[in-house]
């Protein structure tokens, strides 16, 4: 994937979206309820459980595999802005969170629940790697997670994200075999100067 191969130690290829939530008169709005809601909404989307598996010796691009240690708790985080909880504090925290590289040992996404905003407001920072889906796909997922009604009916998950599969995690031997099978194409591209 182009977005993986062009990533550097100082230039990451993830995207992010920041949404400010107004709890209004709600007395039971909390991190735990939001985490449960998000878990329910993304559970049918297999890409959120995939991680990259590097090929030995870097002979081929990484492959998507199911993360056998997947747990939503490793992806949804809780943090607070410092007082007074104004927009400056929020943007500084969001910039800091955005500037950190996603952990490649797990699926390449994070969701940050940000507390401490003035006026009984919260923020949600969605961060995912561009190789997972393009910006429009990320926006559609964000829209499926956020509603403007107090008790909305569930929004449908975009159909292009349902039913996808990695085909199972390849073994070391399968990775070597796949890499050897791709070597003639790689050599032709290298020889052609691609």
Regions found by a protein language model. Name each.
Residues 16-194:
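Soluble acyl-CoA-dependent acyltransferase catalytic core bearing the H(X)4D motif
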């Amino acid at each position: 994937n182009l977005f993986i191969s062009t990533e550097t130690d100082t230039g990451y290829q993830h995207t992010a979206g920041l949404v400010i939530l107004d709890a209004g008169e709600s007395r039971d709005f909390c991190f735990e309820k939001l985490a449960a809601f998000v878990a329910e909404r993304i559970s049918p989307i297999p890409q959120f459980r995939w991680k990259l598996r590097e090929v030995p010796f870097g002979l081929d691009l990484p492959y998507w595999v199911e993360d056998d240690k997947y747990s939503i708790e490793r992806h949804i985080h809780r943090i607070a802005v410092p007082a007074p909880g104004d927009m400056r504090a929020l943007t500084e925290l969001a910039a800091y969170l955005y500037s950190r590289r996603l952990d490649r040992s797990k699926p390449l996404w994070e969701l940050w629940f940000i507390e401490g905003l003035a006026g009984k407001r919260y923020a949600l920072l969605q961060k995912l790697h561009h190789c997972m889906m393009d910006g429009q796909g990320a926006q559609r997922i964000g829209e499926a997670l956020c509603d403007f009604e107090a008790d909305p009916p569930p929004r449908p998950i975009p159909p292009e994200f349902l039913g996808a599969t990695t085909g199972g995690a390849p073994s070391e031997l399968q990775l070597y075999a796949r890499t050897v099978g791709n070597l003639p194409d790689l050599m032709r591209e290298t020889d052609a100067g691609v």
